[in-house]
Amino acid sequence: MKKCPSELNFEAFFHGERGEDDADAAADQKPGGGPHPPPFAMFSAADLSSFGFADSVTSTITGVIPNHIWPQSQSLNARHPAVYTIESQSSICAAASPTSATTLNMKESQTLGGTSGSDSDSESLLDIEGGPCEQSTNPLDVKRMRRMVSNRESARRSRKRKQAHLADLETQVDQLRGENASLFKQLTDANQQFTTAVTDNRILKSDVEALRVKVKMAEDMVARGALSCGLGHLGGLSPALNPRQGACRVPDVLTGLDYAGDDPFTGLSPPEQVQMPGGGEVGDAWGWDNHSNGAMSK
């Protein structure tokens, strides 16, 4: 554990006093050696009053410091009261003022637990923490107090920066959450639209297949109608190719012949005009004479 300069000075002073006591004891044992004059004879009452320390401080010092810390406090006070007061003032100032120590602890707890402070608080804290030590002329104590105040001010500024950064991060988090909710809503709408589009696509595909079947059936019907129309047109141009029309006109040709079913065939009647199916007339129907003549002529 690192010791403060006042403690180091006190230890050096204490070891020096012990060395002087040993030297005095050795001188007393020597023949002709006498005791040394008291060291406080070096300082007069005016010199002691010139120091800026009150008598209450000295009385408080002797009443507060435990005996195990100052084992030879009475002898030291008797031999070097002024030097003792000067050397130990900086180290026991806090112990001499319990109110200042309590205030220091309270301020430290408030600084650690609080969120922020102000410059006026720091100045008032410095004034309160000084207590009886504010009149100290030791530069180490002054530097220590200034360093402590500077550290607390730096910590306060650091806490302010951290709080501002934290507030900024919270604002960004809120914005990102809003954007996330908006994007999630858009994604849900897009999924719904995609599902609807897929359903409509299936319906349209089924409609297209049904229309294709209907178109194919219509094409077949058109092909059949064209074939029947072509056959009908051909039948109107050449009636001889129409079997129905020929079958209907055969009895008309036979009715022009005078033929009895039971009578023997006697030949054809005199030449008559025979109506042909085409509307023409055939004159001079040939008989046996013509037949025989034709055969003979052949």
UniProtKB/Swiss-Prot annotation:
Keywords on record: DNA-binding, Nucleus, Transcription, Transcription regulation
Species this protein is from: Oryza sativa subsp. japonica
Entry's Gene Ontology molecular function annotations: DNA binding; DNA-binding transcription factor activity
Bias-annotated ranges (Low complexity): 109-119
Region (Disordered): 13-39, 104-138, 268-298
Primary location group: nucleus
Gene: RISBZ3
Tissue expression pattern: Expressed in developing endosperm, especially in aleurone layer cells.
Protein role: Transcriptional activator that possesses broad binding specificity for DNA promoter elements with the core sequence 5'-ACGT-3'. May be involved in the regulation of genes expressed during seed development. Binds to the DNA specific sequence 5'-TGAGTCA-3' found in seed storage protein gene promoters.
Domain bZIP positions: 141-204
Taxonomic superkingdom: Eukaryota
Subcellular localization, as worded in the UniProt entry: Nucleus
Region annotation (Leucine-zipper) ranges: 169-183
UniProt-listed CDD domains: bZIP_plant_GBF1
PROSITE patterns to which the protein is assigned, alphabetical: BZIP, BZIP_BASIC
Cellular compartments per GO CC: nucleus
Lineage, uppermost ranks: Eukaryota, Viridiplantae, Streptophyta, Embryophyta, Tracheophyta
Name of protein: bZIP transcription factor RISBZ3
Pfam name, any one: bZIP_1
Assembly, per entry: Heterodimer with RISBZ1/BZIP58.
